[in-house]
């Protein structure tokens, strides 16, 4: 028997047997050997692949050496989950708020006192003369008298009232200093009645020690009185 050469399948028969491979084979046959449609369409890809920079990377190679750290730094700075600060204890927050309030209170008080403090009134010599004369006449002014005096001197009623109050307090202090309370004297002398009165003597005419009766005299006198009594008088308590 003689073997007949097997005829090559027709292109139409291959399409029937392998319908999916037919378009690929037709496309490959249209380009030269070793080139794909992608490589033939973009000749720059072969150049980039030769240097190890495939087009599949989303970020191209850095232009300078310092820029190579930027992508990793961006990933570290912007993590997937946001950073949450640990919650502090509510009691600590209240304590801090109280400390802050206490630290602000003295400064506020100082500012208020500075704002409320009024300038000191300066009286002229003529005004002081009239005020002193009126104070010698009377230490307390009624409301009409105060208004009249304030109008005469060109002052307010409050200024006249405050001046009289200060003058009364000074006058009382002077009286206390002039009278002076008796201080304790440890020298053995009693305090004097007034600063100008003479000192009283320490001994007030007391009898001397030699004139005082002795204890022996008292005993002898009592013994003599006991001897002169009758026995009947002495026996009365026993009979009762």
Curated annotation (Swiss-Prot):
Gene Ontology MF terms in the entry: DNA-binding transcription repressor activity, RNA polymerase II-specific; RNA polymerase II cis-regulatory region sequence-specific DNA binding; sequence-specific DNA binding
PROSITE patterns (UniProt xref): HOMEOBOX_1 (PS00027), HOMEOBOX_2 (PS50071)
Cellular component GO terms, alphabetical: nucleoplasm
UniProt keyword annotation of Nucleus present: yes
Location relative to the cell: Nucleus
Domain of life of the organism encoding this protein: Eukaryota
Segments of the chain annotated as binding DNA: 116-175
Keyword RNA-binding included in the entry's annotation: no
Coiled coil: none
Region named Disordered: 44-70, 175-194
Major subcellular location class: nucleus
Pfam families per record: Homeodomain
Reported tissue expression: Branchial arches, molar and incisor teeth and limbs.
Swiss-Prot/TrEMBL keywords: Developmental protein, DNA-binding, Homeobox, Nucleus
Family listed: Belongs to the distal-less homeobox family.
Function description: May play a role in determining the production of hemoglobin S. May act as a repressor. During embryonic development, plays a role in palatogenesis.
PANTHER family assigned: HOMEOBOX PROTEIN (PTHR24327), HOMEOBOX PROTEIN DLX-4 (PTHR24327:SF21)
Name used for this protein in its record: Homeobox protein DLX-4
